[in-house]
Amino acid sequence: MKTNSEELTVFVQVVESGSFSRAAEQLAMANSAVSRIVKRLEEKLGVNLLNRTTRQLSLTEEGAQYFRRAQRILQEMAAAETEMLAVHEIPQGVLSVDSAMPMVLHLLAPLAAKFNERYPHIRLSLVSSEGYINLIERKVDIALRAGELDDSGLRARHLFDSRFRVIASPEYLAKHGTPQSTEELAGHQCLGFTEPGSLNTWAVLDAQGNPYKISPHFTASSGEILRSLCLSGCGIVCLSDFLVDNDIAEGKLIPLLAEQTSDKTHPFNAVYYSDKAVNLRLRVFLDFLVEELGNNLCG
């Protein structure tokens, strides 16, 4: 005989609750019914899932293996049911989105009107933070971030890849000259980040093939500020291409050291806590970002 969802639900609840009585209370069932269902499940499987003592319950080796699988199955069933129910729902409510200012200005804000036209009942709240934040403490539903995840409690949806470019304004180059090698950057005014210091190691390689670390003449906490400084002729900067592509196309900024620039790309992700995965307004926003940014940005 095959197991059914009721047996999986009861077994998982017993394990998570730590006792038959607490599981029965949470499931609104009699203790005897809970015990009988778990026993029936064990008989179907032909193994003992639980070690029973008068003081506590514990999983057998087979029980631990089965519990992990049963838990995942129930989560997938719940997610599938939610998705089917959501087909007839209208995405609505407030969606709080956090990102560094350059991403807000150059990626999110230009798409806001289109998103609002498609989903008029979702109210976007755009917040700017330069560093990593605790999404729960800040009451943020989703954040856009560069780089890999270092929080195992987060999920990520890949949006696009970006390269870094070294650029300067025509005015700066006319006054100070154009560097022809990475080493010549030492004689120029380089613009860098206040923090983290790792962003001041640029994506250009020196004669030994190593990334070049600058000594900034000006520093700022935001890539958008550095872009403004660069546009005003204050110096040379290294920024992500999504931030400066339009300026380059319009002739406001000039790419430098193309042959020495690394081809390495950096992932940009939308990150959120895993328990937000079935939130309908979050899901449609993620799909929208992947559609728009994936189609319109290239690494």
UniProtKB/Swiss-Prot annotation:
Record-linked InterPro entries: CrgA-like_PBP2 (IPR048071), LysR_subst-bd (IPR005119), Tscrpt_reg_HTH_LysR (IPR000847), WH-like_DNA-bd_sf (IPR036388), WH_DNA-bd_sf (IPR036390), YafC/CrgA (IPR049755)
DNA-binding residues: 20-39
Ranges where the HTH lysR-type domain occurs: 1-60
The organism's place on the tree of life at top rank: Bacteria
Alphabetical UniProt keywords: Activator, DNA-binding, Repressor, Transcription, Transcription regulation
CDD domains: PBP2_CrgA
GO molecular function: DNA-binding transcription factor activity; sequence-specific DNA binding
Homology family: Belongs to the LysR transcriptional regulatory family.
Domain notes: Each subunit contains an N-terminal DNA-binding domain, connected via a long linker helix to a C-terminal regulatory domain.
PANTHER family hit by this protein: HTH-TYPE TRANSCRIPTIONAL REGULATOR, TRANSCRIPTIONAL REGULATORY PROTEIN
Subunit structure: Forms oligomers. Forms an octomeric ring-like structure in solution. May form hexadecamers when bound to target DNA.
Protein name: HTH-type transcriptional regulator CrgA
Organism: Neisseria meningitidis serogroup B (strain ATCC BAA-335 / MC58)
Gene name in the database record: crgA
